[in-house]
C-alpha cells in the first residue's frame, strides 16, 4: 500500500517533502 501512496503524491508519513519519488527513493536508498 506504500506504492500507490508514493505515486499518488508526497506522503507526509514517508518523506513529507514535495519530491515524492525523488525524496522517498533517495531516502530509502540512503537509509542503512
UniProtKB/Swiss-Prot annotation:
Family annotation (Gene3D superfamilies): Oxygen-evolving enhancer protein 3 (PsbQ), four-helix up-down bundle (1.20.120.290)
Record flagged with keyword Thylakoid: yes
UniProt region (Disordered), positions on chain: 1-32
Plastid as UniProt keyword: yes
A Gene Ontology biological process term: photosynthesis
Entries under InterPro entries matching the protein: PsbQ-like_dom_sf (IPR023222)
Keywords of this entry: Chloroplast, Membrane, Photosynthesis, Photosystem II, Plastid, Thylakoid
GO cellular component, one term: photosystem II
Primary location class: plastid
Superkingdom of source: Eukaryota
Intracellular or extracellular location(s): Plastid, Chloroplast thylakoid membrane
Protein family according to the UniProt entry: Belongs to the PsbQ family.
Protein name: Oxygen-evolving enhancer protein 3
Record organism: Pisum sativum (Garden pea)
Lineage, highest ranks first: Eukaryota, Viridiplantae, Streptophyta, Embryophyta, Tracheophyta
Amino acid at each position: 500500500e506504500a506504492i500507490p501512496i508514493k505515486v499518488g503524491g508526497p506522503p507526509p508519513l514517508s518523506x513529507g517533502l514535495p519530491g515524492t519519488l525523488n525524496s522517498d527513493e533517495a531516502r530509502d536508498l540512503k537509509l542503512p
